[in-house]
Amino acid sequence: MQEMSSIPNVIFILCDIANKIELLNSTFDKKKFDVVLSDMAPKACGNKQVDHANIINLCEMSLEIAVKFIKPNGIFITKILQGEYEKEFYQSVKYHFNSVKYFKPKASRKDSSEMYLVSLGFKENLEYI
């Protein structure tokens, strides 16, 4: 895990998210946010299929958090790797948001499968799937 410089009006949480979802629930309770941004990435093992499955797992956890804590019409951004489970995850995000688009930063290597899903217009009152 890497530290990050503070940003005004931003709540930055550095933790192993797999073990902290209940902590987030108790910390933020009924608080809602305009944006949920996940730049999480697992430690790469070098096997593209395993690395992809691991990041999709993190993406699913970040989506679960977004669905719980985001305001209506809110924004969700998450890092993703292209691969076998990408389309299924995309469909899950699309269920909860009006617009979902891929974004590849200019700083990202051209041969990298890393990109971001930028999701706008959170649809309130849908159950997490």
Swiss-Prot record:
This protein's UniProt keywords: Cytoplasm, Methyltransferase, rRNA processing, S-adenosyl-L-methionine, Transferase
A single MF term (Gene Ontology): rRNA (uridine-2'-O-)-methyltransferase activity
Compartments, record wording: Cytoplasm
Record Gene3D superfamilies: Vaccinia Virus protein VP39 (3.40.50.150)
InterPro entries documented for this protein: RNA_methyltr_RlmE, RNA_MeTrfase_FtsJ_dom, SAM-dependent_MTases_sf
Cross-referenced Pfam families: FtsJ
Main localization category: cytoplasm
Active site residues of this protein: 79
UniProt family annotation: Belongs to the class I-like SAM-binding methyltransferase superfamily. RNA methyltransferase RlmE family.
UniProt protein name: Ribosomal RNA large subunit methyltransferase E
The species this protein was found in: Ehrlichia ruminantium (strain Welgevonden)
Top-level taxonomy: Bacteria, Pseudomonadati, Pseudomonadota, Alphaproteobacteria, Rickettsiales
Gene label: rlmE
